[in-house]
């Protein structure tokens, strides 16, 4: 799998030239699939480039949800937020081929009189212990403070494996994760 990002701005480039160069690269490297992991907000120029790439390549090309509308290709979704069940998360995409990012995630939910705030936590250190939440398929800790309640939701290798098994049963065709984060965990996915 060849993964392309839009970390560098893609605007101002010929979509035909980019598509041809990418086709040459895919053929040279014998890539079986391509993932366009584009996170920048869509604009007409970039949408046209993504559509041209999807059309030009002979292998499956997955695109992020920002670029999926109107394209006949797999959609690549970020990890399921921990406060949403996998079933609810995948429902809007039930008629599409889905590639799902696999990652050990953490999230905090801060509950105050004013409402709730959901915040992703980006850390390589994963908490341990805690309680298991059946529907969300994650573990959690709670902390009570004078003015708020803090829930820390987190994945373990076991809960991530359980989520991915559910995702595969719900029609996800591929789980994509970084070896640096997951090691050999995704070998069978």
Residue ranges and their predicted role:
Residues 36, 100, 167:
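Conserved, mostly hydrophobic/aromatic
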Residues 46-52, 56-61, 88-110:
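Active-site region of glycoside hydrolase catalytic domains
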């Amino acid at each position: 799998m060849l993964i392309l990002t839009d970390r560098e701005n893609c605007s101002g480039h010929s979509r035909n030239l980019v598509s041809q160069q990418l086709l040459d690269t895919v053929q040279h490297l014998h890539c079986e699939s391509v993932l366009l992991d584009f996170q920048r907000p869509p604009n007409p120029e970039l949408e046209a480039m993504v559509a041209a790439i999807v059309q030009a390549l002979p292998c499956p090309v997955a695109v992020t949800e920002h670029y999926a509308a109107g394209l006949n290709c797999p959609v690549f979704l970020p990890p399921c937020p921990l406060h949403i069940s996998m079933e609810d998360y995948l429902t809007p995409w039930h008629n599409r081929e889905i590639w799902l990012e696999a990652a050990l995630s953490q999230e905090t939910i801060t509950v105050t009189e004013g409402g709730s705030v959901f915040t992703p936590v980006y850390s390589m250190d994963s908490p341990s212990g805690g309680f298991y939440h059946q529907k969300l398929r994650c573990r959690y800790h709670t902390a009570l403070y004078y003015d708020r309640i803090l829930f820390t939701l987190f994945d373990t290798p076991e809960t991530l494996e359980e989520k991915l098994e559910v995702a595969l049963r719900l029609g996800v065709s591929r789980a994509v994760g970084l070896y640096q984060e997951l090691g050999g965990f995704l070998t069978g996915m």
